Amino acid sequence: MKTAKELIFDRFIAPLQTSRANYIGIEIEMPIVNLNGEKTDKTVSIAAMKKAIEHFGFTPQKFDDDGVCHEAVCPDTCDIFSFDCSYNNFEIALGRVRTLHEAQARFRDYVSFINAELYQNQHTLTGLGVNPNYLINDFNFVPSPRYRMLAGYLKKAEVWRSISPAGSDFHPYYGFGTFSSASQVQLDVNEENVCQAIEAFSLVEPLKAVLFANSTLPELPELLCVRDYFWERSAHGINPRNVGFFKPFPKSIGEITDYLSKASIFCAERDGKYLFFYPIPFDEYLNRDRIEGEYYDGAYHPFRFSPEAEDVAYLRTYKQIDLTARGTLEFRSACTQPLHQAMTVAAFHLGLMNRIEALTELLSRSFLYREGGDPDLLRRKMNRVDFLSAVEPEALKVLLLNVLTLCAEGLRERGYAEELYLEPLFERAKTLTSPSLRLLRHGGDLDSVIREYAAL
């Protein structure tokens, strides 16, 4: 069997050596909200997706244990409709696009149609990072093998609390995937720029918290964005290499390979069974004779198996920035945005990818980092309601505007007039107001915010 590092290289590094045409990958998850303030009716969600599949000519691809389609793909564009974790959370994953205008046009068409269907039953997709009715919603995951595995794994934190070094920090929201939504972007990278891109975009993470925070919980009134909390204080965070930031920033391909070889694997598949187990660093996993796992078949049952080299396909992390097996960096930390501003997240990353060196230089000499600031600690501060107590507001405003100006230059250089998608971010920077802050300052009329953030 190949070593862990050799397997990591083949899966994650080799794709960086292939020349590609700099496409954009965009995935937007959206909560399905019952406008009557009641729990989401999954029959309404399922019916709306069925109509959308028929209307847009998608092909049903995955079905749950009850025969309900929970994922469908467009044969022409490779766009995907799916329910992410639960029937309360709808995801549109756009196939590779060359311009943001192309992405925006398809996204608008899909959301307009689906919301027209949902509105007939007083439901809507909206642009919030947490479903506002999460406390009364059904927390059940989609009843399919993969999601039953994930549900079992996250719930197992109750048992692992006593044996994990991170156990005392576990949160009680084991079903957070059923009510949290993100806007994720994938951009092509190569061997030459991947390390620099990881560093530059890690440095900008605290500023992203200021611009994109859009997930609040009444039980955690101090936080503007609960995404980091959900992932880092769940079973996914047992190994710090699987969440958060690269520490330290990798300076070479060898350092990336070494880092990922010590990230943990927590699932595999045998005999058609999706298995989960206590997360094990991948290099240790390959050296084990037997692994004690569990699978679902009416209930969770034990299953012993031996590691195989092919299991590297199940190794994945949930970091702020992930290196994927497609030769891309996936940016995962942004909450879903108000739907009329859905392309802001992609525009931000796309523009800065064209200005990596200038971004690194700007941030390194900024007040955030010139005295050795830690982007992880800074992001935690910026995620808080009282973040302005940790910085000088005018200095923060100037830095945000300078970063956005760099971003606009990067987009302008592409020649597609995509910089227009940054306009809401310039306004947020000038006022130091994220969608979360806007919601909190709205005065409690949640229904009007739900409708406003659902508008295109």
Would you name each region that the model predicts?
Residues 177-183:
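Short, conserved phosphate-binding/catalytic loop or strand-edge motifs used
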Residues 138-152, 227-238:
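Short, low-order "capping/linker" segments at domain edges
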Residues 1-91, 95-97, 176-177, 192-199, ...:
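C-terminal accessory/tail domains of diverse enzymes
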Residues 99, 104-144, 231:
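Contiguous, non-catalytic segments that form substrate-binding/exosite surfaces or channel walls
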Residues 143-170:
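Acidic, His- and aromatic-enriched active-site or binding-groove loops in soluble protein domains
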Residues 93-104, 186-188:
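The substrate-binding groove and active-site-proximal loops of carbohydrate-active enzymes
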Residues 30, 94, 122, 127-131, ...:
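Glycine-rich, histidine-containing beta strand-loop boundary motifs that form or position
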Residues 76-80, 110-114, 118, 160-175, ...:
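Structured alpha-helical segments in the cores of large, soluble enzyme domains
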